[in-house]
Amino acid sequence: MEFGLKKRARHEVKVEVASLETKYPHNVMLYHYPPTEDVHIDEFEELALERLRLLRVLDRASTRNLRVLSDEWKEIVSADLTREGLRSYLRLCSTGGSAKHEADIQTRRRDYLSHFILRLAYCRSEDLARWFVAREMELFRYKFAALSSFEVKQFLEANGFEIHPLTEAQKDEVKDGLYESTVGQSVAKIELLDFYKVPFTQVLDLVRGRRCFLKAGYAYVNTHDLVSLVGTKQQDEIEQGLQAAKTMVEDVEADERISRTLKALHNSYTGRDYTVCRDAAVPIESLDQLSKTSMPLCMRMCHEHIRANHHIKHSGRMQYGLFLKGIGVALEDSLRFWREEFTKKMDADKFTRSYEYNIYHNYGKKGSMVNYTPYSCAKIIKDVAGPGDCHGCPYKNMDQGSLKTKLSSYGLSASAIDEVMFFVSRGHYQIGCGKYFQLTHNSPVEPSINHPNNYFEESQIAMGNRQKRANGSAPPKARIRPDIKGHGDRSMLMGDDDDELWRIAETQERIMQSQKDISEAFNDDLDLTQIDY
């Protein structure tokens, strides 16, 4: 791929459909040949984030211990894709493989390009590569399962598979074995299925699961299970492609913007931007009650720490203060909340000198005028709390005994605590948080939690205090971290973009006024945000 780096106005990329239909004729492709078209840096980043959102949907489904392609798995993935604004990919995974609609053809292009972009990000370590291959194979199986028998034949022919369905006479010779080995299908349906005769060594997973008929060293595989054979080739293609991508990384990353995008991609936040709350305003008088009903554990514990100690360290102030801004606490109310608590242990002048300016700064009203975004789960999980701290993710940072005690004090039964701890003990902290939400809200559905403000919003919706947003609305456009050295718009940046921005902000603040309590730098967390070139 070639990446055009000249500045251009942002607009929807729309490539000539006729040429695309020739390049991408099928929903299911083996990603054998790298794309050759030019891709602008803006679209490069947008495609990378879009596919990351797609793979994360599959990752969340995989942590629920559901069988891939089971009805429950499909239901969860379908709902999550819709919620993430990825309905075009949902259509790609659930409709005919060679549809000629323009939207489908454009989605195939995005699918193909984004796969190769992510190879450049996930070839860097065995762990990243393993995660990428697993998710891509789930996506491949999902798409392949939607193909009809005729479309499967088209796919096999287009990709050089020298296998053909059995003739009726050939099927009749082994029909008894086919009836016995094909689980979950009636005799009438089995007679309508296509079967393929392949060396048993090519479908060892089917052999192990006794899901095919074996005779004389050959396996007889029906259309639905043929994904086992073609999936092996797909996985080989991806694994070899990752090895090839390693040799390209140095050349591709000669451009700093691409390098920054690829290195930060896996840990980037891809959800909604909570910089400004567009729903109801939240008065500080309601925070005590809201902490019990609508705040996730990480924020509830911060709130209780402040109420008990009338102070909280810098990292905790950032985590909780930005959360309050995101749920709808106005600047004036935020100042009043922090002042009322902190002045219980210090005089008002000290609070004004040491803390007030930082609050203005977080709301983008002083200094560098950066309107920071509340921390995502990815950012919070990475933060480790030291002695006397209360920030970070309690599901990760607390020992299991203390966490169980805390959950019990919040009213969870022993069996409910065990449900939460099942996921926490396996490192699935966000799913544990979602289970906590489900149990405390008596919700029939366990939500996917990727942001504390997302948790709060879902809680308010469940309690009837806010209306649910239109289903399937697309999230904000994929955005990239700003080039701080340039002159682009820096009025709205992610709170995770810490070290470099904070140093610039401090320099400006020293010039504007003498403030000494804003010198603590954030931890480096290269999230992808807004950029103009």
Swiss-Prot record:
It comes from the Eukaryota. Residues 466-492 are annotated as: Disordered. Disruption phenotype: Mutants exhibit eye defects and a delay in the S- phase of the cell cycle. Keywords: 4Fe-4S, DNA replication, DNA-binding, Iron, Iron-sulfur, Metal-binding, Primosome. Expressed in embryos (at protein level). Its cofactor is [4Fe-4S] cluster. It comes from Drosophila melanogaster. Belongs to the eukaryotic-type primase large subunit family. One of its GO terms (cellular component) is alpha DNA polymerase:primase complex. [4Fe-4S] cluster binds at C298, C377, C393, C433. GO terms for biological process: compound eye morphogenesis; DNA replication; DNA replication initiation; DNA replication, synthesis of primer; DNA-templated DNA replication; mitotic cell cycle. Binds 1 [4Fe-4S] cluster. GO terms for molecular function: 4 iron, 4 sulfur cluster binding; DNA binding; metal ion binding. Regulatory subunit of the DNA primase complex and component of the DNA polymerase alpha complex (also known as the alpha DNA polymerase-primase complex) which play an essential role in the initiation of DNA synthesis. During the S phase of the cell cycle, the DNA polymerase alpha complex (composed of a catalytic subunit PolA1, an accessory subunit PolA2 and two primase subunits, the catalytic subunit Prim1 and the regulatory subunit Prim2) is recruited to DNA at the replicative forks. Residues 480-490 have a biased composition (Basic and acidic residues). Heterodimer of a catalytic subunit Prim1 and a regulatory subunit Prim2, also known as the DNA primase complex. Component of the alpha DNA polymerase complex (also known as the alpha DNA polymerase-primase complex) consisting of four subunits: the catalytic subunit PolA1, the regulatory subunit PolA2, and the primase complex subunits Prim1 and Prim2 respectively. PolA1 associates with the DNA primase complex before association with PolA2. The lineage of its organism: Eukaryota, Metazoa, Ecdysozoa, Arthropoda, Hexapoda. InterPro entries: DNA_primase_lsu_euk, DNA_primase_lsu_euk/arc. This is DNA primase large subunit.
